Regions:
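Absolute protein N-terminus
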Residues: 1-2, 141
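Small/aliphatic-rich secondary-structure junction motif
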Residues: 2-51
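Phosphate- and divalent-cation-binding pockets in alpha/beta enzyme and binding domains
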Residues: 16, 94, 116
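Class I S-adenosyl-L-methionine
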Residues: 22, 69-76
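General small-molecule cofactor/ligand-binding pocket signal
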Residues: 35-37, 83-87, 138
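A short acidic, glycine-rich active-site loop
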Residues: 54-66
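Structural beta-alpha unit
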Residues: 73-107
Length: 141
């Protein structure tokens, strides 16, 4: 069974990539295993001095669920079973690490996300994942 990792952040381009990927699933003889991944940026500065770790973890979980919501809805609408995950860290590093952990066959990613670089043709996260990953990457525009 093929295993796909789709990093999503809740952006329009991320959700469009999920919608296009769903259309491609007809090409496969058997239903693949699909993992949605949302990566939250770690809290910076002195936040931990004022907010307890549990509250920070809850914040990351809440924001991660928001980032996954539309993609999960698209999968549900199409009747596709998927697993979803939320992690915290540097997005490109966490995407590649998680893809290796689950032994995925391909990373499917949109060209841009919610980051500062969203106006560029190819966002920095997608670009770095394509450069650094030893796992094949499918960029869906």
């Amino acid at each position: 069974m093929l295993k796909f990792l789709l990093p999503v952040d809740g952006s329009d381009t991320s959700n469009e990539a999920v919608a296009e990927f769903i259309k491609l699933l007809d090409w496969y003889k058997e239903e693949p295993e699909i993992h949605l991944l949302n990566v939250q940026f770690p809290q910076r500065g002195n936040v931990a001095l004022f907010i307890d770790k549990e509250s920070i973890n809850l914040y990351h979980q809440d924001e991660g669920m928001k980032g996954l919501q539309a993609a999960r809805g698209l999968m549900d609408q199409a009747g596709i079973v998927c697993q979803f995950h939320i992690t915290v860290g540097n997005p490109e590093e966490m995407i590649i690490r998680y893809a290796k952990e689950i032994n995925c066959d391909q990373i499917v990613i949109g060209p841009r996300g919610l980051g500062v670089m969203k106006g560029l043709l190819l966002g920095s996260v997608a670009s770095k994942v394509m450069q650094l990953s030893t796992i094949p990457v499918l960029l869906i525009k």
